[in-house]
Amino acid sequence: MKIKANKLQIEVEDTGGSGEVVVLIMGLGMQLVAWPVELVQALVQQGYRVIRHDNRDIGLSEKFDHLGTPNLFWESVKFRIGLSTKPPYTLHDMAQDTLGVLDTLGIQRAHIVGASMGGMIAQHVAIAAP
């Protein structure tokens, strides 16, 4: 389902009942469907409510095509030699998207799990809303 979160249209899958919430955040370029179905089912069978979402610019969530595609190699070179980089959005922005999803769904507490870059986003979520 699509929901409005952090002023964006975010694709969300909400599975399970009314137990404790587990948010699964996938990494760079990966959609929510990349989480193994067996993992989601096991969490639900243990009584958890599982929330997965496509990060901004990925899958069925809102795209930022108008910003163009950054050259990741060049951006990493600039970063390594101390030049400034201007990403179209940051990990903090993506963490705010996750918090927006939780707010829209009326969720105040959750366990946050991230894979790869999703783990970096999860750290920003924990910093912003311990």
Q: Model-derived features: where do they sit?
A:
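Conserved hydrolase catalytic core segment
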Residues: Q108-P130
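Conserved HGGG/HGGXW glycine-rich cap/lid loop of the alpha/beta-hydrolase fold
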Residues: N6-R80
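Active-site acidic short loop of glycosyltransferases
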Residues: A5, G17-G19, D103-R109
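Conserved acidic catalytic loop of the alpha/beta-hydrolase fold
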Residues: F79-A110
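Hydrophobic/aromatic ligand-binding patch that stacks against planar heteroaromatic rings
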Residues: A42, V101, H124-A128
